[in-house]
UniProtKB/Swiss-Prot annotation:
Keyword Zinc-finger: no
More about this protein: This enzyme does not require pyridoxal phosphate (PLP) as a cofactor.
Catalytic activity: trans-4-hydroxy-L-proline = cis-4-hydroxy-D-proline
Organism of this sequence: Pseudomonas aeruginosa (strain ATCC 15692 / DSM 22644 / CIP 104116 / JCM 14847 / LMG 12228 / 1C / PRS 101 / PAO1)
Activity: how regulated: Inhibited by iodoacetate, iodoacetamide and by high amounts (10 mM) of pyrrole-2-carboxylate (PYC). Not inhibited by PYC at 1 mM.
Keyword Isomerase attributed: yes
Protein name: 4-hydroxyproline 2-epimerase
Family in the record: Belongs to the proline racemase family.
Domain of life, per lineage: Bacteria
Length: 314
């Protein structure tokens, strides 16, 4: 029998499953190399942890790793039901909250290595977490895609740690009782982008679709379709970073000015940015602040005679 030790948390309603023991050894390379090894040689462990019957399509997994730099707090590899993520904002907040719950860190600034670079997380005295993300930028403005059954949809392509297609003029109602329609709409947009080979820089797959609308209690409300076709319950840390990059590029948000981003279920992140290297008009360095709550400590058991020990593959 195999055992996987986990800490579950949620950040604004979006769950994170932190793996703290039981996965195969991935060597001493950087997080990008370890992610490659996990995907190529040990992907069954991701599936066992995230897929049904032990997980769900809503879960984001976070494998806790020893960092390359001994001055860093931790390394982490993020994954979900469809594969691997470069960075995850809500997951980083969940990681920090879980490490604090375990007594491994206290309030202060902590460096975390990810497959797309190092981020800086601050655990505040009130329990909230700020994540100083990897640089974000808008790659292309108002790109149009013809979506079968919908028509022409225009949006910005931006990087916030993952690739996003950000749409404001969509005509959809962003509400918790309209999730099926929102999912169908964003899935169709994502499929059209893929079919028409519309991609991020260097051919990066656009695997997140983000819709925006007004919100009475925040600067904006969003609906984010994640890889694997689940929607983000949180306001999405990397998605908010991509949004800040677009606002900065359009001159609609000043450096240091707060931006309150609400999710489709009403949870909120606060975002701010500064220009990378102090150069206006280029990439930004976004900081996202939110809160996570630990919901479980558990050990997943993978019995030798369990036909679904390694997940239900569809």
């Amino acid at each position: 029998m195999q055992r996987i030790r986990i800490i579950d948390s949620h950040t604004g309603g979006e769950p994170t499953r932190l793996v703290i023991g039981g996965f195969p050894d991935l060597g001493q390379g950087d997080m990008a190399e370890r992610r490659r090894l996990l995907g190529e040689r040990h992907d069954a462990w991701r599936a066992a942890c995230i897929l049904e019957p032990r997980g769900s399509d809503v879960l984001v997994g976070a494998l806790l790793c020893a960092p390359v730099d001994p001055e860093a707090c931790a390394g982490v590899i993020f994954f979900n039901n469809s594969g691997y993520l470069g960075m995850c904002g809500h997951g980083t907040i969940g990681l920090v909250a879980s490490l604090a719950h375990l007594g491994r860190i206290g309030p202060g600034v902590h460096r975390i290595e990810t497959p797309v670079g190092e981020v800086e997380a601050t655990l505040h005295e009130d329990g909230s977490v700020s994540v100083r993300n990897v640089p974000a930028y808008r790659y292309r403005r108002q790109v149009s895609v013809e979506v079968p059954g919908i028509g022409r949809v225009s949006g910005d392509i931006a990087w916030g740690g993952n690739w996003f297609f950000l749409v404001a003029g969509h005509g959809q109602r962003l509400a918790g009782d309209n999730l099926d329609a929102l999912t169908a709409y964003t899935v169709a947009v994502q499929q059209a982008l893929d079919d028409q080979d519309i991609r991020g820089e260097d051919g990066g797959a656009i695997d997140h679709i983000e819709l925006f609308a007004d919100d009475p209690h925040a600067d904006s409300r969003n609906f984010v379709l994640c890889p694997g076709k689940a929607y983000d319950r949180s306001p999405c840390g990397t998605g908010t970073s991509a949004k800040l990059a677009c606002l900065a590029a359009d001159g609609k948000l000043l450096p240091g000015q707060p931006w309150r981003q609400a999710s489709v279920i009403g949870s909120q992140f606060e975002g701010r940015y500064e220009w990378l290297d102090g150069q206006p008009g280029g990439p930004i360095v976004p900081t996202i602040r939110g809160r996570a709550h630990v919901s479980a400590e558990a050990t997943l058991l993978l019995a030798d005679d369990d036909p679904f020990a390694w997940g239900i593959r569809r």
